[in-house]
Amino acid sequence: MNVAVAVSGGTDSLYTLATLREAFGNHHVFALHARFKEQITNDPVPALKEQCHNLNVPLHVVDLHKEFNELIIRPFIKAYADGKTPNPCVHCNAKVKFGLLQKKAQELGANQIATGHYVSLIDHDLYGKALKCGADSTKDQSYFLALTPREQLQTAIFPLGTLRKTEVRERLQKMGLEVPLPKESQEICFVPNDDYRKFLQSSDVDLLSEGRMVMLDGTLVGKHKGLWKYTEGQRRGLGVSWSEPLYVAHKNHSCNELVLGTAKDILVDTCTAQDINFLVPQDNWPKELFVRTRYRQQAVPADIQFVTNTSSSKKITIHFHSPQLPAAPGQLAAIFDKSGYVLAGGLITNDL
């Protein structure tokens, strides 16, 4: 068995490489680094080469910046222009890390690919090989893998699933390994300083400018600075003085209007999602289901209704057991069981 370890230059992937090299030996493990940018500052490759030399494992570097631009960056920009709030990490996992990079690993002779995601892949009696939340709830990345096809995860290895971040750092220190990029990666890797507004403004896509900001009953309360700068459920940065805290209820893209409401007024009990990716066959789902529509959100109880439509992709309606803040179209809805196994994922729509 040969294992390719996807390495970025950070703590998690370096530990993954070191621990698998120890488990399988240097003749069955190699490192694989993908370049996602044409021009790179603080290039980790020289330091990665040194660490791979110390571990006596080969390092392969592949240039995927053109593919990354077409598959991730351009759709990210277009989604904002269309009034959505995309999650590029979800698509990167599905199309790049467990898509293009996995294919490259196979071409180089790997049977399996390992990453530093904080998740576990467990043989379940009913589900088969199933994805489960990481033990470190502050780092758990199961949400971001809910759109990755089941078959692409079957040959994955996730050594960090049972560990906490502090343990990973301590173990690396004991191994005497120095992290090439000691600083934690930013929220969106291709957006400088996590300033997505500045990034979008520098793009070549037309973005809606300022427009009316109204309450749910139509009362005009001000002007917004462009719908793409706001997301459903947002509270901070609205620039409106009101007797109660206001939140974004929804964005009316057709007339460039931002609709606000108080917390109790904007709560919803349903949302819809499409392009459903099944990580566990629906027939094997338990009765108790839980849904997350945001990364940092705790999964909440919900019922799932499958909607029959004429399109080839499946669509679902999510019925929350208790009212929730509105979910942003373009974000991911991930479905879990009560033990933290990921059952499916889909993209949230603005259908009612």
From Swiss-Prot:
GO biological process terms held by the UniProt record: tRNA wobble position uridine thiolation
**Which positions in this protein are listed as binding ATP?**
6-13, 116
User: Domain of life, per the record?
Assistant: Bacteria
The cysteines covalently paired via disulfide bonds are 92-189
Q: Give the coiled coil ranges.
A: none
Q: Write out the ranges of the annotated region (Interaction with tRNA).
A: 139-141, 294-295
Entry's EC annotation: 2.8.1.13
An example Gene Ontology CC term for this record: cytoplasm
The family this protein is said to belong to? Belongs to the MnmA/TRMU family.
| HAMAP family membership | tRNA_thiouridyl_MnmA (MF_00144)
Q: What is this protein called?
A: tRNA-specific 2-thiouridylase MnmA
User: Species name for this entry?
Assistant: Lawsonia intracellularis (strain PHE/MN1-00)
